[in-house]
Regions:
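Conserved HGGG/HGGXW glycine-rich cap/lid loop of the alpha/beta-hydrolase fold
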Residues: 45, 51-94
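Alpha/beta-hydrolase fold catalytic core
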Residues: 1-56, 80-82, 121-122, 301-302
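Conserved alpha/beta-hydrolase catalytic His-Asp/Glu region
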Residues: 162-164, 182-241
Length: 302
């Protein structure tokens, strides 16, 4: 009984101290929409994106609960010889929630196609990390006419035997999800971010602050809860339809999506090659942009 009381008290303390209201979008834009940030209207959404460099186009899609800022290291290096476009996906960053709540990978791939049309893109290389990788390979199946190459960085989307992380299960819960939508202590977010790095000492407080503040943008947490409730769609059965050169990058210390799933992507996509990034975790492109982008540069030079 005493342990139960202590547990209940601890829960109340977390709930009381962890409550965080949504952040005002305009205040966040004033802080984070600095050059070269732009906005474009796409299917009812005011989309935050960055477009830099000249040459063959590379479109990069970030992971869940992240933003275009996770690609900044890659973008700076790739833009020396390429046009590099990054964006905040619906329910993320400064773009904010989709009024129609379209967060399934296939739906976000269609949004991405509308975005590409708004920017009048032709054919391009598409890359994505985690959730963004899931969207990227869906896009390659749904719109093969536009895809020149595919880059998957610790990508999601394959059926997994391991249980989903506790945080994901809580967010998807019909009981606890609405509570967690408002209770988001910074220390829990910081802990989750550390778990995405092969070497957690590389994670800076500035990155934690940025990701945390953008996560609190009005509507983003509710969008995350909706997204986590999405089930698998079986589209992985069509991975064999992807015939463009494909680079599968995986941090060998990824504990979020294990490296064996990189092997599975390599085996199931006809022209795929796998490159393991030594010592890096789930957010390899952010943890070490120079090391992780090197195989990408070789792919683009072919």
């Amino acid at each position: 009984m005493r342990r139960l009381a202590i547990g209940a008290l601890a829960t109340l303390v977390v709930l009381a101290t962890g409550f965080r209201p949504d952040r005002d979008p305009l205040a966040l834009e004033a802080r984070y929409a600095t050059p070269p940030s732009k906005f474009v209207e796409v299917d009812g959404l005011r989309v935050h994106y960055r477009d830099r460099g000249a040459g063959p186009t590379v479109l990069l899609v970030h992971g869940g609960s992240a933003s275009l800022f996770s690609w900044e290291g890659w973008a700076a290096l790739l833009a020396l010889h390429h046009r590099v476009i990054t964006l905040d996906m619906p329910g993320h960053g400064l773009t904010g929630p989709d009024p129609k709540a379209r967060y399934a990978p296939a739906e976000m791939a269609e949004f991405l196609d509308a975005f590409a049309s708004a920017l009048r893109l032709g054919r391009f290389t598409i890359g994505g990390q985690s959730m963004g990788g899931d969207v990227a390979w869906h896009y390659a199946i749904q719109h093969p006419e536009r895809v020149e190459r595919l880059i998957l960085v610790d990508a999601n989307g394959l059926p997994r035997l391991e249980p989903r992380p506790m945080g994901s299960r809580i967010r998807a819960s019909s009981v606890l999800g609405p509570v967690v939508r408002w209770v988001t202590p910074r220390f829990i977010v910081a802990s989750a971010l550390r778990d995405t790095y092969g070497d957690p000492s590389r994670l800076t407080e500035a990155v934690v602050d940025r990701d945390y503040e953008l996560m609190l943008r009005d509507g983003n947490r509710e969008a995350t809860r909706t997204r986590f409730a999405e089930g698998e769609d079986g589209m992985d059965a069509r991975l064999g339809e992807i015939h463009v050169p494909t680079l599968v990058l995986w941090g060998d210390r990824d504990q979020v999506i294990l490296p064996k799933y990189g092997e599975e992507f390599r085996a199931r996509i006809p022209r795929a090659e796998l490159f393991l990034l030594r010592g890096l975790g789930h957010m390899s492109m952010e943890e070490d942009p120079v090391a992780s982008v090197a195989p990408v540069l070789r792919l683009l030079d072919r």
